[in-house]
């Protein structure tokens, strides 16, 4: 991390000292240099199965965090970008995007405010990393008896860990939680799993969110904005929080009737399933996916679990890649590279046009 940051800063310093107008290409090369190192590290921080690797990646990312703000606050780079005479509409758009990035990053603020803006931006990024880490490494499990897992497919049950008494030990990962909420017949068990999933990250993440909200407000104030919402949407199509709220109100009014009808349908299904008066049952968050799945099966005769047999994973992945090749004029080539889990597959992506042959990767 230290070495890569030093290289990036050296490249940035060299670009700042240049006098020519090819700043767009310089900016692009520097961005690629940073991303080629930073993105794989970010991926490892999120998915590596070894905690030591995740922790090392986290520490590395925290060292790299200040650089993006340093680029956005560079006065020499800002002056170079402003001096560029765009050759075409693409250059004009890129120039405008960069100018806005500089202005939003604090390049035009007085020195004291600029320094504080960098401190705030860096801390917000660190809070985000820690928030994600708390979610990814939450050790919470939900222990259920076999009876509480009634309704679950055999394949799902076979893949779950069990304790010495035969009880299921459920993690909070997507392949565990989503099928359970869709299929488990016990509303009490669904509630346990739903509550655990929605508390993922724990109380610590609530403190991080509170701190981030305060920092965002302070950042908006530094830029002369009344709140972070105004600061965040000023460059976007909506431009103002009022326009966003008006749009959301329009959407809500348009879907109110449909939402009420669908909720009534789900409540009716719950009443039928539980044998209660249709006017009685409350529909809770942990009920929704279960009764949506029941209604879907009854109305369309579609069973997601039954469909799995027709879409084996390996063949489905290859078909999707072949389809993408036809649609986008690209070519996927599988490679053997070091990966963080035995199930991970690596593909290089190439344009089909031979003279370009520009590689990417997934």
Q: What is each PLM-predicted segment?
A:
Residues 94-96, 118, 123-126, 133, ...:
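Active-site-proximal, well-structured secondary-structure segments within enzyme catalytic domains
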Residues 133, 174, 188, 193, ...:
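Substrate/cofactor-recognition hotspot
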């Amino acid at each position: 991390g230290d070495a890569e940051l030093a290289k990036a800063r050296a490249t940035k310093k060299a670009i700042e000292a240049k006098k020519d107008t090819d700043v767009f290409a310089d900016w692009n090369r520097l961005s690629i240099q940073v991303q080629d190192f930073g993105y794989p590290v970010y991926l490892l921080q999120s998915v590596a199965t070894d905690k030591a690797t995740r922790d090392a990646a986290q520490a590395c990312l925290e060292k790299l965090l200040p650089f993006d703000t340093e680029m956005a606050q560079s006065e020499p780079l800002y002056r170079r970008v402003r001096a560029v005479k765009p050759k075409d509409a693409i250059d004009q758009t890129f120039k405008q995007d960069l100018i806005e990035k500089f202005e939003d990053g604090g390049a035009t603020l007085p020195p004291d405010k600029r320094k504080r803006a960098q401190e705030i931006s860096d801390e917000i990024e660190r809070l985000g990393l820690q928030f994600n880490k708390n979610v990814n490494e939450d050790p919470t499990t939900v222990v259920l008896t076999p009876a509480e897992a009634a309704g679950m497919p055999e394949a799902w049950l076979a893949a779950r860990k069990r304790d010495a008494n035969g009880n299921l030990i459920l993690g909070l990962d997507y392949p565990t939680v989503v099928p359970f909420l869709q299929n488990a017949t016990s509303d009490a068990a669904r509630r346990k799993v739903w509550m655990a999933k929605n508390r993922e990250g724990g109380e610590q993440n609530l403190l991080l969110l509170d701190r981030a909200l305060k920092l965002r407000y302070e950042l908006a104030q530094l830029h002369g904005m009344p709140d972070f919402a105004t600061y965040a949407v000023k460059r976007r199509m909506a431009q103002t929080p009022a326009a966003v709220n008006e749009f959301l109100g329009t959407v809500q009014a348009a879907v109110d009737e449909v939402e009420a009808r669908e909720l009534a349908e789900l409540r009716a299904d719950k009443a039928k399933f539980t044998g209660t008066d249709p006017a009685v049952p409350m529909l809770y968050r942990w009920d929704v996916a279960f009764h949506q799945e029941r209604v879907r099966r009854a109305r369309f005769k579609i069973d997601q679990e039954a469909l799995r047999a027709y879409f084996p994973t390996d063949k489905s992945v290859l078909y999707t890649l072949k389809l993408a090749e036809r649609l986008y004029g690209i070519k996927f080539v599988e490679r053997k590279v070091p990966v963080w889990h035995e199930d991970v597959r690596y593909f290089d992506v190439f344009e089909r046009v031979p003279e370009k042959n520009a590689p990417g990767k997934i």
